[in-house]
Amino acid sequence: MEDPIFGGAVVYVCEHNEKGVLGVVINKPTDMTMEVLFDRIDLKLSEGLRSAVVDEPIMFGGPVQDDRGFVLHTPGGRFSSSLTVTDEVAFTTSIDVLEAVASGAGPERMLVSIGYAGWSPGQLEEELLRNGWLTVGADAHVLFDLPILLFFIRVTLSWLALWSLLQLRRYNHAFFDSLH
């Protein structure tokens, strides 16, 4: 996709319903770190946690509400504004998840973004029909364990593997049809 915002982006779709689609770009780090974010919102990390999260980058989640934070994380804890995406992933828009992180009671793994990606009803479907996006399955491993650089590579390789299988299937059908 040749778009200044979404070109090369890997978007994790959190919700898709009759109102549209909500997703988070997961492979475009900003120059902000968790340390800077916590300073800006006046939260102090407990000393034992500083080294674990201080250098983690904040992602550019998308152009919608790019003045707000959004957190993809492993489930657990009671946060005031959370959406269960899968059994392994939750999406929280309230500051209490970051307060829990600061106190040492936060989620095991997380990805923090500024902004999110949103599509109106039918918009993403139209972009998919025009081959504007490649779609692959995702899981907590992709979100929380892969280095940022590998997100795009893994997604691209998954798509290439699927494309190769489809081409092989098409070739095999043509070959076997020619034998009749």
In which residue ranges do the predicted regions lie?
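A short aromatic-anchored loop/beta-hairpin motif
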Residues: 1-180
